[in-house]
């Protein structure tokens, strides 16, 4: 179970972080970069000061380094892919250096052992297949699994004003309206109105910058579930979220074949227990848990996707992703776990 010692993470820390990282949305990440701490507190049944103190704690220990604001992927028809590859551990460092040079790489999540996730952006099926095959070849991958996160559909038009506001908030999504207004040369009222519209239309999302090695008495882990097709994926996902409610910080659902659940666990035995338990659920073909060793974030290297000439002429600011109106938010259920 989660530790309660001073300086260590507990269930409240995890749930507060999950509320900001994903919230109740079915999207892979939160589509509300300005969600109020009061709303989070009310949803969790705690006070607003506790929410602020827990976030300050996550920042203070170095785990949560900041947030980045991006445009909804569906606005450009690009897609994010999370590719899990099993590699030769002796070549991991060289492989990472090679992967960092590839275009469209957003993040590399290195696991303890012989696996890693490579997150990259792709424009179409052809380029997706080409990039995935190249990564697998570079890794000498013995096996791989492709997960394709689904973002909400969005067709809102973005003006130059919207683009400037988004850029001003790119590295600080909670920047004060007055500060943004001064930076972009618009009134605070205009900034507020425009941003509220973008949030309402699900045109933007936030992604955190994290350092898993900074956690004390806990570990970040990735639970990958392969569905068997004998049970609806929604039913399977809800059961997993209910069973692991105290340790899930993010659920990537919507892919017909796989579900990815990011966890924070405090016992190494959970690495064995969780996949064994989840693997016994109806509708699950297999489950595996990998402990995160390191996380390399290359969000700024994606800037080229925002500046391509043909895109800039058609829209004020590009985005990158694939939408799916079919994804439904998993139900939240109160439960306790021992992970």
Regions flagged by a language model, labelled:
Residues 1-339:
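A compositional/biophysical signature of low hydrophobicity enriched in polar/charged and small residues
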